[in-house]
């Protein structure tokens, strides 16, 4: 029986089939060869094959193709080889962009739900009722946007967990699921899930009227309790501001912050905005809070305000404004606990904003460092000029007193007393100005801020470093000069012996028996004695 019958194929040599040495054929779906089924011994034999042949593929593959396959295996997420630094950085950058995009979409759908909720609430009070089809359709739209928002929030936190794994080099996502993170995700999902559900549901709302203290009961919609908490979705705006901030996205800023142990979070971005444009931030925050609080009070007071005082939007804005400014005229008061709670939060927020406004105005009215230096220089110049004028007045009055008392035949006592009075005034003025100048100098010394001290310290450090470098260079030169002097001293010490050897060479040693034998054997070599005349 020939080898072809054993191989199961025509024209294929023995031992080259698919099952030879446990190697399987190439899987067309995966695009790579299947793993061998043999033990480690055969795998070692496959690794020891020549570089020109690929053990995992057909013969004739070049080494370049093998290297390309290895690079593809490294890029695959399921490969056993660890990813390179460039691959991790690229993956991290892509996750950053995806997280930013998800945050933008979440803010869009969150704001869309709030706008539709406000529209449905206003239309249900004046255009149609809660039982109408339009109200049901708008509530279904709110529910759809809420479901999409919840999905985006989950995807956002999934990207955050992936970023945590990339930053810390972890493989299991359960490592990142701490109790704090789980609680935060649960709270965020609960806040975003609150919305008015489709349908018409009512409850009995009891309250006590403000002026008459008469109990009041009214049938209110459940949508009121589910619509007001939807404004908590505005926290997504702070997240978008953080992710789109240039300080957060700039790699150099993040590196400097990491070196200085500064955490780039929403609090840091808010402080930065308050430093750059405090007036704009306070204005936008105050107006937004004013509008939201006024609409919330209107919704809370609608069912118990028969005279339509606080249930009117303009009346609610007036109530919120006088509460925000801590004035409290008392002409309008809320009836329900919901309205009272909103007014309480508005008063606390107004007190904080008032303090911030005072701080911002005080900072704007304060002179800058350059303006302080110019002002102090001008005041010092004026004080110096006034002191010189006072000293000149003292000398002048002294001369006039001497002139009217000694250089005239008949002194005029009234004129003398007048000049003496001016003399004393000039002395007191000079002393006072000198005291003012000393105090001005103290103020100038105290005006040196920490920035000036830090700058002076840095300048002193640079000067000391330069002096230290020059001292080290001078010490190196002195060491080199000392070594050269040592060499020169050794040369000078050896100079007399060298001169003596050059003038009077040493005589050869006295010939012994061995020298005589050598002289006898070699007649050309002879020995001449050295006389005293040769040495001079």
Curated annotation (Swiss-Prot):
Catalyzed reactions per annotation: K(+)(in) = K(+)(out)
Keywords associated with the record: Calmodulin-binding, Cytoplasm, Ion channel, Ion transport, Membrane, Transmembrane, Transmembrane helix, Transport
Region listing for Disordered, in residue ranges: 1-90, 514-536
MF term (GO), any: inward rectifier potassium channel activity
Biased composition (Acidic residues): 65-75
One family name in Pfam for this protein: Ion_trans_2
Intramembrane segments: 342-362
Keyword Ion transport: yes
Region (Calmodulin-binding): 380-459
Gene3D superfamilies linked to this entry: 1.10.287.70
Biased composition (Polar residues): 515-536
Gene for this chain: Kcnn1
Protein name, UniProt field: Small conductance calcium-activated potassium channel protein 1
Transmembrane feature ranges: 107-127, 136-156, 224-244, 273-293, 313-333, 487-507
Entries under InterPro entries matching the protein: CaM-bd_dom, CaM-bd_dom_sf, K_chnl_Ca-activ_SK, K_chnl_dom
Free-text note regarding domains: The coiled-coil domaim mediates heteromeic assembly.
Function noted in UniProt: Small conductance calcium-activated potassium channel that mediates the voltage-independent transmembrane transfer of potassium across the cell membrane through a constitutive interaction with calmodulin which binds the intracellular calcium allowing its opening. The current is characterized by a voltage-independent activation, an intracellular calcium concentration increase-dependent activation and a single-channel conductance of about 3 picosiemens.
Protein location: Membrane; Cytoplasm, Myofibril, Sarcomere, Z line
Entry's Gene Ontology cellular component terms: cytoplasm; neuron projection; neuronal cell body; plasma membrane; Z disc
Quaternary structure (record): Homodimer. Heteromultimer with KCNN2 and KCNN3. The complex is composed of 4 channel subunits each of which binds to a calmodulin subunit which regulates the channel activity through calcium-binding. Interacts with calmodulin.
